Amino acid sequence: MRPYQRTGVAWLLHLFRNELGGILADEMGLGKTLQALAFLSSLKKEKDSALPSLVVCPASLIENWRRETIRFCPEFQVLVHHGSTRTSVPTSLTGYDLIITSYGTLIRDKEIFENLPLLCVIGDEAQYLKNRKTQNAQAISALTSEGRILLT
């Protein structure tokens, strides 16, 4: 990791430890996904938690998140909750370190996620959440988690 990425991870950990949310914003291609994954990996070790974290992103980025997670956090058990093969049983979402879904799937499967305790929620492409009256913003706000981070 580059020094500015390490600083970003340290800042995300500081926010989480102080029960604050935050927005990690920079230019495209500077490693926000890597920083978020390093943050989640550090958090998982620090908290020794069995709770999964959730990444909510545009459908076009799901595969990128899955690939980057396998590359940078091979120890993570990852579930992509998207498409026609996704589960409708909330208990089948337990046992994972990271669940990746899209904003549209989160809205459609709101009942599944509303009662699922999460370690951290990461909303990628935060412009999808600018208006708090939208279904995207309401669905992500309804989630129960110990921390929340947005990326943009």
What is the role of each PLM region?
Residues M1-T152:
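ASCE P-loop NTPase motor core, strongest for the SF2 helicase catalytic module
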